[in-house]
């Protein structure tokens, strides 16, 4: 990759150079570690002091933060890349420097891979060692499937998708263009569907065949060891642009709206529909058959047990952390709230009765 100049990065990202546009940028680094020739960024005012002290070749900043630096008298003689959104600008520049994306130009099918004769694998694809691609599977252009991957019968993988080692895409499932699936991801395993057959001797759970698919849209990224189950009859759908973190469970028949992000260890029960542009915190969990409105934010660890119909809300159900002894005392109070409520209600009734009895006669 040719080393870009600060001016080139500004042009590519709609930013403005304050300083030397011909400065060669050799890499990216945090504010407190960046050296000459390296680019860093400031997107959180908590790190303003680090920006003031930084030895970076250049720093991505907002116009407002650059004025704060100037007010401290530390802007002159340094290089700045002024962007409307420094964090987004940094992300786009980082894509340019991403070694994994820019150096893996391999194509072809490794001799140790197994590809069904009728599978469609364009010459621009790379199929790594021990990959298995079953009958009728169709891959788009420039797909990369790394070691030990599995693509089931009649599954479809879109253009420019990247499947890291040990990813499994079950039969008939769909992965969209430019998707990134990290190691251990499983797309399209059976949903947790069993019909209880109750008798005098107990309960037998009869398996319900899961005949739907799991369908991922374009530009979806799924973190390591996440499972997205196939639908029971209809499909499980992850719409375009969703980003799902590690160890997330998406159950059968769930639909996740476009550009929603879900942090690690969250779990979504069957047939729940999450709207577009939602933000789901880590370890949040959702009961089944719910509807969650667009642009909803759910804090980490929150349990959602009812539908949310109003867009744009922020919901939290986690008890804040405290020193252990204080938490135990508060927990004891919480356990007694129902009895305390009964006492308050009884007291209110008694006070109302006393008030009624003390009013003067109208005779």
From Swiss-Prot:
SUPFAM superfamilies: Trimeric LpxA-like enzymes (SSF51161). It catalyses: a UDP-3-O-[(3R)-3-hydroxyacyl]-alpha-D-glucosamine + a (3R)-hydroxyacyl-[ACP] = a UDP-2-N,3-O-bis[(3R)-3-hydroxyacyl]-alpha-D-glucosamine + holo-[ACP] + H(+). It is an enzyme of class 2 (transferase). InterPro entries: Hexapep (IPR001451), LpxD (IPR007691), Trimer_LpxA-like_sf (IPR011004), UDP_GlcNAc_AcTrfase_non-rep (IPR020573). It comes from the Bacteria. One of its GO terms (cellular component) is membrane. Pathway: Bacterial outer membrane biogenesis; LPS lipid A biosynthesis. Gene3D superfamilies: Hexapeptide repeat proteins, MurE/MurF, N-terminal domain. The active site is at 252 (proton acceptor). It holds the Pfam family LpxD. GO terms for biological process: lipid A biosynthetic process. CDD domains: LbH_LpxD (cd03352). One of its GO terms (molecular function) is N-acyltransferase activity. The keyword DNA-binding does not apply. PROSITE patterns: HEXAPEP_TRANSFERASES. Keywords: Acyltransferase, Lipid A biosynthesis, Lipid biosynthesis, Lipid metabolism, Repeat, Transferase. Its EC number is 2.3.1.191. Belongs to the transferase hexapeptide repeat family. LpxD subfamily. Catalyzes the N-acylation of UDP-3-O-acylglucosamine using 3-hydroxyacyl-ACP as the acyl donor. Is involved in the biosynthesis of lipid A, a phosphorylated glycolipid that anchors the lipopolysaccharide to the outer membrane of the cell. Homotrimer. This is UDP-3-O-acylglucosamine N-acyltransferase. It comes from Cupriavidus taiwanensis (strain DSM 17343 / BCRC 17206 / CCUG 44338 / CIP 107171 / LMG 19424 / R1). The gene is lpxD.
